Amino acid sequence: MKSMMEPQGLGLVPMVVEQSGRGERAYDIYSRLLKERIVFLVGPVTDESANLVVAQMLFLESENPDKDIHFYINSPGGSITAGMSIYDTMNFIKPDVSTLCIGQAASMGAFLLAAGTHGKRFALENSRVMIHQPLLYGGGLSGQVTDIEIHARELVKVKAKMNELLAKHSGQTLERVQSDTERDNFMSAEEARAYGMIDKVLSSRRDVTA
């Protein structure tokens, strides 16, 4: 049976068996890592994946509101509304949320990476980050012209808001962010650090406390 804590669409998930005085207990690997306050966002940002991340963060806050949550991101991005539910939860809960890019953090994934607690935003050395303007999904968009205009105006407002927040978290000027997100803008881990998307590039666990 698939665990509710398990990232979606990953196929076979390893199990971990722990021994205790009460016998053996088996966990899927993601549930076991959740005990260490590690939350994964793997794959596209969807309503389903966002709901799992939000639920895990709220659970970890209830377990210990004063201990950091470690949020690992390997995502090409996805839904803005789903991503913003994660973003608002990160700000709402009491624990600091340390973010770590493993593989890639693109689009909404990059936004969530930058939104971690300042001083606690990391990327592994061969990961990559990509920022761009919001996308309108659904090439077959149809409907009344007036409704399409309404959606277009809303997307312009969303773009402005996302640029403001990215400027806030990166420390870049709004004008710089507006220019840099006009097209896909890829960064290496070190370039992401220089831009202000993260605070440190990690090559080993020792680098976290160095």
Swiss-Prot record:
A Pfam family annotated for this UniProt entry: CLP_protease
SUPFAM superfamilies in the record: ClpP/crotonase (SSF52096)
GO CC terms of this entry: cytoplasm; endopeptidase Clp complex
EC id: 3.4.21.92
Residues at the catalytic site: S107, H132
Keyword terms, alphabetized: Cytoplasm, Hydrolase, Protease, Serine protease
Gene Ontology biological process terms from the UniProt entry: protein quality control for misfolded or incompletely synthesized proteins
Cellular location(s): Cytoplasm
Catalyzed reaction equations: Hydrolysis of proteins to small peptides in the presence of ATP and magnesium. alpha-casein is the usual test substrate. In the absence of ATP, only oligopeptides shorter than five residues are hydrolyzed (such as succinyl-Leu-Tyr-|-NHMec, and Leu-Tyr-Leu-|-Tyr-Trp, in which cleavage of the -Tyr-|-Leu- and -Tyr-|-Trp bonds also occurs)
Domain of life where this protein originates: Bacteria
Matching InterPro entries: ClpP, ClpP/crotonase-like_dom_sf, ClpP/TepA, ClpP_His_AS, ClpP_Ser_AS
GO molecular function: ATP-dependent peptidase activity; ATPase binding; serine-type endopeptidase activity
Biological role: Cleaves peptides in various proteins in a process that requires ATP hydrolysis. Has a chymotrypsin-like activity. Plays a major role in the degradation of misfolded proteins.
Quaternary structure note: Fourteen ClpP subunits assemble into 2 heptameric rings which stack back to back to give a disk-like structure with a central cavity, resembling the structure of eukaryotic proteasomes.
Family: Belongs to the peptidase S14 family.
The protein, known as: ATP-dependent Clp protease proteolytic subunit
Organism encoding this protein: Chromobacterium violaceum (strain ATCC 12472 / DSM 30191 / JCM 1249 / CCUG 213 / NBRC 12614 / NCIMB 9131 / NCTC 9757 / MK)
Organism phylogeny: Bacteria, Pseudomonadati, Pseudomonadota, Betaproteobacteria, Neisseriales
